[in-house]
């Protein structure tokens, strides 16, 4: 997707572009997190583009990496109980128990680890000699 694509004159408030590998489960090596980085760079030129990631992988690793690549939205399937009849049961996060809370905590931790694009000196960097 290039900037030229958006020059057709269609007005939208926000345009969410999510990288998605359409497999259940999607192998982590097929996540293409670099596409999220491309959408992030595109969002710097086109302010209403919101980069994101549609997580069809198992766990939170790819979603955390998407945050590091600039994703501002993560889409993840959720479930209540066993839904083995569905095609996404293996990748869905269970809403009961701690699984969903842990997934969200991982995302929030990734956001903190990424920090901002502004270089700052943290208290942890001040050495006491």
Q: What is each of the regions a protein language model found here?
A:
Residues 1-129:
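Catalytic cores and adjacent flexible loops of soluble metabolic enzymes
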């Amino acid at each position: 997707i290039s900037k030229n694509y958006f020059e057709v004159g269609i007005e939208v408030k926000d345009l969410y572009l999510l990288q998605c590998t359409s497999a259940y489960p999607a192998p982590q090596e097929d996540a293409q997190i670099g596409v999220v980085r491309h959408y992030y760079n595109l969002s710097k030129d086109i302010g209403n583009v919101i980069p994101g990631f549609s997580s069809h992988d198992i766990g939170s690793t790819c979603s955390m990496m998407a945050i590091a690549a600039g994703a501002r939205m993560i889409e993840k399937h959720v479930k209540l109980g066993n839904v083995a009849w569905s095609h996404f049961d293996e990748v869905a996060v269970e809403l009961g128990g701690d699984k969903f809370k842990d997934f969200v905590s991982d995302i929030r931790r990734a956001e903190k680890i990424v920090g901002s694009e502004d270089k700052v000196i943290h208290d942890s960097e001040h050495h006491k000699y």
